[in-house]
Amino acid sequence: MAAKEVKFSDSARHKMVNGVNILADAVKVTLGPKGRNVVLERSYGSPTITKDGVSVAKEIELKDKFENMGAQMVKEVASKTSDVAGDGTTTATVLAQSIVKEGMKYVAAGMNPMDLKRGIDKAVVATVEELKKLSKPCTTGKEIAQVGSISANSDPEIGKIIADAMEKVGKEGVITVEDGSGLQNELEVVEGMQFDRGYLSPYFINNADRQIALLESPFILLHDKKISNIRDLLPVLEQVAKAGKPLLIIAEDVDGEALATLVVNNIRGILKTCAVKAPGFGDRRKAMLEDIAILTGGTVIAEEVGLSLEKATLAELGQAKRVEVGKEETTIIDGAGDTQNIEGRVKQIRAQIEEATSDYDKEKLQERVAKLAGGVALIKVGAATEVEMKEKKARVEDALHATRAAVEEGIVPGGGVALLRTRSAVSNLKGDNHDQDAGIKIVLRALEEPLRQIVANCGDEPSVVINKVLEGTENFGYNAASSEYGDMVQMGVLDPTKVTRYALQHAASIAGLMLTTDALVAEVPKEEGAGGGMGGGMGGMGGMGGMGGMDM
């Protein structure tokens, strides 16, 4: 085991605070509408230019191991806030730095770190309660667009495209972001349920212009096994032919004489049909067939539940207003399923999302919810260069997270005003002793910090602006983009309550841990010898991992 170096009390805290300051100072210059850019070196290709706090934080690794510990703990604040709320990373970093800086002064003066932490925790609880009182629901498209614009560093075009996407696929719909091919941002919407399986034979195509099989008001047969024998299918085909409607068959596979018979009937115009493979694999396939059954008001004909293909009736078939089957995808529009059943299914999948441990499973379950709840929207980000594309895409993703958070928990006035307005609730708090009172004071000071930084990044005087904002009430604040005072909500400067709340809670949590830290343990750096050089060289290979994130 390698030898360790241990630092205690003041010298340990001093090193840790240095690390916090280096990381926070690099991140906080990006805060606000006039935030500055940070250029990140890439081991391969051109450097990345960003105004996204968490991207900057993730890049920072310090040479001094003790300073690096402090930096990594603040990095945790940024990435945790980003994971849960999707935005607010820079605000969280600014708050954490302020709480640590102020707190360390009190610790150096001999106050009890545990009592300071208790005071900080009390103040945070009071602030969160006050934020909830200030919060208003975010319902209109205009408000959603405003939240998106602010989060995308005051880009109204991004806000608008996100609001349009949410309007089209609903608040719960899946919205994905990908690289576009032009200079403009584009929005593409897929209505209804779409899955990535196309027709099993091109002879099913009945719309030559679009090269798709289009079925109007079809019956939908769902089967979890392979269909090869036409005898199994005949009874249900006869019933569908009598009803005079088209038929879509979704099964594990359809081949042999069954497929040949369907194709011949289709060409001769006796029965309009189309066959596709069921989406997914294994257990996921069963679940998706069940989803389609609930969406279309049908039943999956499976031996497990005692149903067989030859005894299937029209009552077991699903129905939809329209089905479009392309070469590689099938879209079911306006399924005839019962709304309550669909809602119940969505609730059930949501419960599975809560329990899912892997990101992949969560993503797949989320897709299933979207397909049931109203469709998928695709935002294609346009840009002139690859560097701009990456930066813009990151901002669109941030804005998307922020708008979801706003819809979930509501909105508060932005630009650091909401935190400033909670000061009255915090200043009335009393701790159990003098040290806890000091902890409350630390948070009081930290609540000003985001606004201070926004104003500083604009090149204005923070103290003057803060005093003027404190003279006003409720939504009155300073719009840094236009350098004017007024009602922040009317000016469209809004923050999601969830983002502001998480930024403060995560910042206070990590800062509290730092204040109560009394020893740091790190490996003693190895002497650079003949063998050491080789180890260092191999370490450089770690940079290759970064290539995974590149758009090749």
UniProtKB/Swiss-Prot annotation:
Keywords: ATP-binding, Chaperone, Cytoplasm, Isomerase, Nucleotide-binding. The keyword Chaperone applies. It is found in: Cytoplasm. It comes from the Bacteria. SUPFAM superfamilies: GroEL apical domain-like, GroEL equatorial domain-like, GroEL-intermediate domain like. Pfam families: Cpn60_TCP1 (PF00118). CDD domains: GroEL. It catalyses: ATP + H2O + a folded polypeptide = ADP + phosphate + an unfolded polypeptide. GO terms for biological process: protein refolding. Its EC number is 5.6.1.7. GO terms for molecular function: ATP binding; ATP-dependent protein folding chaperone; isomerase activity; unfolded protein binding. ATP binds at residues 30-33, 51, 87-91, 415, 479-481, 495. Gene3D superfamilies: GroEL, GroEL-like equatorial domain, TCP-1-like chaperonin intermediate domain. Together with its co-chaperonin GroES, plays an essential role in assisting protein folding. The GroEL-GroES system forms a nano-cage that allows encapsulation of the non-native substrate proteins and provides a physical environment optimized to promote and accelerate protein folding. Belongs to the chaperonin (HSP60) family. Forms a cylinder of 14 subunits composed of two heptameric rings stacked back-to-back. Interacts with the co-chaperonin GroES. PANTHER family: 60 KDA HEAT SHOCK PROTEIN, MITOCHONDRIAL. This is Chaperonin GroEL. It comes from Nitrosospira multiformis (strain ATCC 25196 / NCIMB 11849 / C 71). The lineage of its organism: Bacteria, Pseudomonadati, Pseudomonadota, Betaproteobacteria, Nitrosomonadales. The gene is groEL.
